[in-house]
């Protein structure tokens, strides 16, 4: 028995008339009558009683109708689930973020819009440093990641630059530079004698951007592997905690100002050497997952539509 036989049987049962069922199915009446007889022959039972003006189900036919409808319904759900998966509208997606990425409004909005468009996709979000996110992507332990990196290419990955946002300096609230007007920008060179708390290890975008800005301003920041002036923090929360404790200052993306912490104030920077933090979306090159392609295409198209290219804040 084939799937079409179940559809033939259900159509005749619902119409109560072979001719009307044939019209509904788009086939001729004689072949449909033959198919119904073939089904009854295969089952070894009578499914319909012939009447003067149509047919009616026998008790055996009523039982078969219930199961036939269930089978067809289950198959239709399976077909639709398969189609959704092929379109990237069903499945799983693991999204990686650096601890600063969610502060930029694009990131939570991208995830929200995707979930609204593809509610059948199970989305999980994991937080790591950019270097760790890249390792997980390359190791196929993550699907996509919002990263802060100065590199536009990585082995086996596609890195889509999204946003270049200016960085601000986070200062202890008791710092002399924090006492001026809130909207007064600080010349970057005035940070030359400060102890810098760097976010992340060398090779991450914000670390490299801070070092480059200091050098462009004519000084080397007080950072290193030894000495009291050395401070590095793996997460933005720990970075700001060290700032609040008075252990130094830190350059952070301007969007991080949304994070209020007692003992920390933010000030914009001015001068020719202003650091900028690049936010990118990374994924594996030629990833076969339709869900990944759907997310990346949807997000990149959203950014391009809004900004005609890489965004600036």
Where are these regions (language model features)?
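A late-sequence structural motif
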Residues: 198, 250, 255-256, 265-310
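A short LG(V/I)-centered, amphipathic sequence patch enriched
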Residues: 40-59
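Short helix-boundary/capping micro-motifs
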Residues: 12-31, 44
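N-terminal winged-helix
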Residues: 29-30, 80, 86-118, 122-126, ...
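Hydrophobic/proline-rich hinge and linker segments of small-molecule sensing/allosteric domains
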Residues: 158-202, 276-286, 298-300, 304
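Secondary-structure junction motif
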Residues: 104-107, 184-186, 194-221, 289, ...
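Short beta-strand-centered segments that line the small-molecule binding cleft or hinge
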Residues: 70-73, 85, 109-113, 126, ...
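Hydrophobic hinge/microswitch elements
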Residues: 129-133, 138-142, 148, 201-267
């Amino acid at each position: 028995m084939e799937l079409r036989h179940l559809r033939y049987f259900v159509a005749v049962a619902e119409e109560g008339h072979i001719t009307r069922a044939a019209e509904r199915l788009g086939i001729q009446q004689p072949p449909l009558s033959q198919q119904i007889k073939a089904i009854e022959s295969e089952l070894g039972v009578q499914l319909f009683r012939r009447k003067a003006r149509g047919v009616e189900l026998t008790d055996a036919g009523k039982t078969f109708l219930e199961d036939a409808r269930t089978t067809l319904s289950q198959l239709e759900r399976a077909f639709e689930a398969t189609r959704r998966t092929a379109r990237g509208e069903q499945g799983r997606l693991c999204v990686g973020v650096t601890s600063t990425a969610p502060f930029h409004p694009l990131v939570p909005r991208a995830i929200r819009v995707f979930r609204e468009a593809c509610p059948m996709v199970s989305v999980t979000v994991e937080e790591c440093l950019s270097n760790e996110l890249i390792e997980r992507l390359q190791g196929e332990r993550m699907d996509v990641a919002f990263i802060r990196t100065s590199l536009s290419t990585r082995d086996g990955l596609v890195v889509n630059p999204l946003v270049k946002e200016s960085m601000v300096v986070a200062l202890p609230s008791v710092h002399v530079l924090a006492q001026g007007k809130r909207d007064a920008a600080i010349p970057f060179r005035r940070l030359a004698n400060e102890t810098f708390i760097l976010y992340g290890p060398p090779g991450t975008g914000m670390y490299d951007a801070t070092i480059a800005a200091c050098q462009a301003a004519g000084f080397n920041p007080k950072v290193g592997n030894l000495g009291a002036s050395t401070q590095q923090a793996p997460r933005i929360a720990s970075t700001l905690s060290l700032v609040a404790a008075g252990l130094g200052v830190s350059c952070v993306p301007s969007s991080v100002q949304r994070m209020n912490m007692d003992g920390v104030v933010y000030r914009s920077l001015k001068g020719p050497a202003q650091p900028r933090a690049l936010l990118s979306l990374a994924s594996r090159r030629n990833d076969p997952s339709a869900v990944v392609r759907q997310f990346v295409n949807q997000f990149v198209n959203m950014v391009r539509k809004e900004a005609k290219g890489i965004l600036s804040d």
